């Protein structure tokens, strides 16, 4: 690609991005927290109460707000989305068993599988989205696995395949219903990694509620942040009570005795973190609407662009946490030049997640033929997607 084309491409993308963003900001990150006066007010109330650790009214307030948004009776707050994932895998017990993980995900997903004693097996995303490709997954299962004594086993390794992780990538709701049907056919559990997808809905169900367990992240770059934090969504009360006990150091409830009945974890969210989240979630619908407006502006302005495009979602209502822009195939070689150009102009876009099967610590993990995830990584950039008033 010649320098004239590269320069014209970079200028075109920069110009269009700027048209979508407020002009009174000196630099733009992919996603920054929305810390309004309301948030500071709730934080001050929490500090005044002195309840800043693992108990306090803000844990209950944030939990109730999430129950109303998500439509689940059973939600636990954790100290990170990664902890929530670990707890889900620990609860279904994946020790020495394989777990299907999309290669297009954040590193916390396979890390949590390994920390819980499992072995990730990576599969591709679809051409039309960054989410797991159900048809590709089914073909991979047919070729590589068989049902033996009621368990799904790898034909080569003999190991049991226990679970499929469905990642709702960048906030876009995956077709979880189809994957759950496929999982049932192979006697597999399904865990939903909805880390960035709070507010995303498909088939009138909030992400994280269709499978046995789902997780949300409240990291600093999420649509609602608690600084660090996460949540576990449960379908069954039994799982909820089990995990609640384990993440609370397995302490036996008593007014004054301090006793424990198993080796537990301390993975709860602190009240002060919950206060930070509650101060934002009060305005959740307003935030969602602003995010969707920004996404639509991006879609409109890049709809007939010569160089790039935005993948549009089908049959789902998404929170538009992060909007991703993709170069057309013939301009793939301009990817790094474009990112560098935009960063030099104070628009701090990022690459997409590098596919997990390409990372050095996972290079020996089994995986399907992965084409779409690699192409998306090579052509995609995450645009400034913060909540702009």
Language model regions located:
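N-terminal "arm"/small-domain region of PLP-dependent enzymes with the aminotransferase-like
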Residues: 1-52, 383-384
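Active-site phosphate-binding strand-loop segment of PLP-dependent enzymes
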Residues: 128-226, 233, 237-238
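Hydrophobic/aromatic ligand-binding patch that stacks against planar heteroaromatic rings
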Residues: 111-113, 182, 206, 272
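Structured binding elements
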Residues: 117
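PLP-dependent aminotransferase class I/II
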Residues: 60-64, 69-73, 135, 147-159, ...
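Phosphate-binding glycine-rich loop
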Residues: 52-98, 104, 112-114, 122-124, ...
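Anion (oxyanion) recognition and catalysis
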Residues: 114, 180, 184, 343
